[in-house]
Amino acid sequence: MIITVTLNPSIDRTISMPDLKIGSVNRCELISVDPAGKGVNVSRALDEFGVKTYAILVCGDLGAEWFDRKLDEVHIPHAIVHAPGITRNNVTIIEGHGDVTKINEPGITLSKDVINDVKDSLDAIEIKDNWVVFAGKLNPGAPISTYKDLAEFARSRGAKIAIDSSGPEFKAAMEMVPDLI
C-alpha cells in the first residue's frame, strides 16, 4: 500500500472561457471542482491504476466535509486531520486560445498539535513495509524540517519514504535520505 500525506491540500477549480478580460465581468463556459494537492493527486492516480492507497490530509474546518465526501465518492480510504481555518482553494483559468492562468492560495497554518495528529493518523494504520509519500509545498509558517521530522517518524515505524516537494523543505528532508525523491 502507498500512503500519501498532504499537509496543504486544495479545492481546485478549473474554469474555461473564450477570453479572460481583466477588469471586466467574465462568464465561464465550463467549470470543474476537484480534490487536489500533490499527495491527494498521487492517491487519485494510484487508485486509477488499481494500486492500494490511503490518503492522510490536513483540512481546515471549512473544506474538511467536502474533501471527506469527494474522497468517499471515488472510494479512496482516507483520514482527515482537522485544523482551524479554511482549506485553500486554487483556481485555474483556461482561455480558448490556450493561455492558462493559475491563482493558488497559500493554505492554513499548521500547529504542533496538528502535526501530532498527522503522526497519530500514521500510527492508526499499518505503515510497516509500506510506502509513505510526503508531497507538496509546505504550509505558510511551517518549519522547514516538517517533512524531515514526519518522514523520520514514519521510517521509525518501518515505512519506506518518498518525498515530492521543492525548496528549503525538500533540502531539509534530504538529510534523512529518503528512499525515493
Name the predicted role of every residue range.
Residues 1-56, 65-66:
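Glycine-rich phosphate/adenosyl-contacting loop at the front of the ribokinase-like
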Residues 30-37, 86, 109-113, 145, ...:
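Residues at secondary-structure transition points
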Residues 45, 70, 149, 153:
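Rossmann-fold NAD(P)-dependent oxidoreductase module
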